Amino acid sequence: MKSGMTRLALGTVALLLAASALAEPVADLEGPIGGWRNSKLTNELEQYTAAYPKPPVDRGAQKYRTLIAGRIRAAGKQRRPPVLVVNGNAMPLYGDGEGRFARPWAFGPGSNSVEIVSADGQSRQRLQFYEADTTKTSAKLRAVLTWDDPRAEVDMHVISPIGDHAFWAQPLLSDGGGLDVDSVDGAGPEIFSTAAPRPGVWLFYVNYWGNFNAGGYNFDEKAHDRDLITAQLTLIYNENTPNERREFVTVPLRKIGELALMKSIRF
């Protein structure tokens, strides 16, 4: 009896894996390219790149980042967005009306991966590339803030051990770390990183600032998709190294103007 149940369970698992493998890709991924690469041999990282769709406020673009770009095939037909997973960091993937997207990411040396997963988890596309430029700096501390309402404007605020404050109006810290400037407006995620975090206590806050739509920003309590917004903070230490570790914090947001301390860490 147990043997028969085991065979049945194994058969079910095999069918699920086969269905997942045969599922249509959720997106056409145009970049990055898988395989071996050396940033010193190209000028890609010297070019200015910005997120797309363009956020409500254009804060320009930044250098030294690689574009994760492509097109979501079933744009506008899904209730939930697909998920973009970069080096294990999961975040909602939103596109424009035609499904096009571009997410800049500062990849470090070594093995890197990009994966797009359908909302139901049945389709997975994954590519991997190896960055051979060992002079590139890796983020010793990275924070990724995501939330589940694309019409809500949610902000991350980071306070450094010396009192520096990184947020949407002043995204960079005096010592060089800070928020990606084009991640601070729109549906997110918001990304903070530093290659040399100061020793001491770091504070990470989340603020439900307002909402936005085609007409711009607004403070209408009903102009969003969810009554309860779930914000998740992912903290990555020593990213893409043998010493990498992660922490996850989830906070509910109910009202515009709400401010909450998500995490306090000592580095």
Which ranges hold each PLM region?
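N-terminal signal peptide c-region/cleavage motif recognized by signal peptidases
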Residues: 18-20
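Short, compositionally biased P/S/T/A/G/V-rich stretches that sit at domain boundaries
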Residues: 23-62
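Aromatic/hydrophobic beta-strand junction motif of beta-rich domains
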Residues: 66-76
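Short beta-strand segments within Ig-like beta-sandwich modules, predominantly Fibronectin type-III
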Residues: 90-98
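Surface-exposed, short loops/turns at beta-strand junctions within beta-sandwich domains
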Residues: 104-111, 198
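Short, aromatic- and glycine-rich surface loops/edge beta-strands on solvent-exposed regions
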Residues: 109-121, 204
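Edge beta-strands of extracellular beta-sandwich domains
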Residues: 123-133
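Intrinsic-disorder/low-complexity signal
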Residues: 136-267
